[in-house]
Amino acid sequence: MTIRFYIHTIAKRAKAIALVDSGATENFMNLTYARWLRLPIHPLEQPRKIFNVNRTENKSSELKYYTDLKVQTGTTRSSLHFFLTNLGENKAILSYSWFMAT
């Protein structure tokens, strides 16, 4: 399932479409997209491993960066923590816990 959402920054409001993933334990955003939006990007103190759906380690990538953003879906606004990585064509993945909280 996908959902349309807005990212609020000091300078602008950007529209994006996110994939809602019932198996995701965290929120993710495409690092290239975050750089394109000129979002604040922060390094993680310790890089984190990424695991595939079958619970094997993803050897092509690890999490090194994050950003904290204000986002809006419909009339609901929230502050979310996104880990930044390569998501291919996807702009963002919203976790199951986010979905249940809205």
Where are these regions (language model features)?
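Aspartic protease
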Residues: M1-Y6, I10-T102
